[in-house]
């Protein structure tokens, strides 16, 4: 569509697999699955939207139950505690958006060692601590596309500001 060229410029080819492996994961084909989503924090628009998308996908699949749970502030220690508690409960999968890519790795490895599938989104961990990481686009591609779009709209001498947060 016209006007969406910037959105596709940041896309890249699929990356080769670089993740860890669960140990002794049981064959769950056709059986009920319990998955927990532990984002950086709960109660904000972005993670409310990802949670809704996961709920919608679970409903489509039919045999998946997804629970979104996590800290109300972006706190890695609390996030680790949530994941550890769900490992103890015996979930089949952990979805996460890491508050700290290194600090979260041991609890994710613990999940893998327990045969639990681990997938990150939005904010990665170290690769060996999860199976897959899903990201919307690469940051440098998004940034380049945004600046290219700005220049196309305003010219190459326009003034602009950048606002960011964590």
Regions found by a protein language model. Give the residues of each.
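A residue-level marker of the well-folded mature domains of exported/periplasmic proteins
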Residues: 1-166
